């Protein structure tokens, strides 16, 4: 009876409402569109270095610094984006005398600016435009190319003012065209003390001091010193990866009124074996501000790997050339250091009439996030070298490098490395240790 009454009430209600029951409409929940606010990126670095000299010099020096960079990348709009990044380093006073006392022997200069400066500056500021397979980047930026590069071996890297165009329209091929006008020299350059033939053949020109402490100086001035302003360096490259296991690259650097440098490299990997070769040729151009340049270097490398274990051996040779700049040694004023046979600090393989060989091995403990490496390199330096003219000697360097990626802290890398040059110059030895913490975000 109760059911009958209830059905009657429902039926009456439906009739009064016109007999149609309208379903309840549930409005869909619309997720708020995420607004692209751009990206903050950077690296915080803490660096401790300790070097003890022996032989013709007896001294211990060490430094502790903190710094790095922080930057912002805008959202992309119609292919355009922009980046700005500030760089800086601050060295701590860990000795009784201050680091800014020029000529102090207690502090290592490679973590500071010129004259042990603490400094900060805008190191990157560029506009990027991407369309199709082409990318254009104009402004202050980091470069990592064979003969002009960041050389990020201490607190702050080399940075450049440049326009760079890259294109991948051709299958398996990357084309690069760049024009570089200025460089700001990173803190590593200060390890050379004063510009010299040593610095010029080790990545830092005769005018590198003009570009320290965050200053950007003309590429010609960086290479050869004051009064050698030029139109910069124009570079082009072709990188080809169309054959399985084979990677070919060819670079040409036209340093206006100084030199033209050609860099070639081939890498071939077959199963666990990798074979590589490289070649550098330099010749003077235009007003020949560096004098007659006639330099040639070549090197080969063979490596193999098995599981987490890998190793390689390399050999290089730089020819001599009478009456040429650096007697035929390779001029590398803009941080480029691609040599297979370089040490952690010793870069004598680019000296005139010098043969070098190197062996190295590493092991990855993948489960622990640890990679450990060891190496030994030897340089047979000829008498025509311009670092110690008229002297022939054998220099060597051994060392190790241990890196630990901390799993509990994303982006944190801890590093302990050391180098032990013997007869860097005849009778000059040292032991150097570095402890580095990098936090990338």
Q: What is the predicted function of each stretch?
A:
Residues 132-136, 154-331, 376, 380-382, ...:
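Signature for the C-terminal beta-barrel architecture of outer-membrane proteins
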Residues 325-351:
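Flexible internal linker/loop segments at domain or repeat junctions
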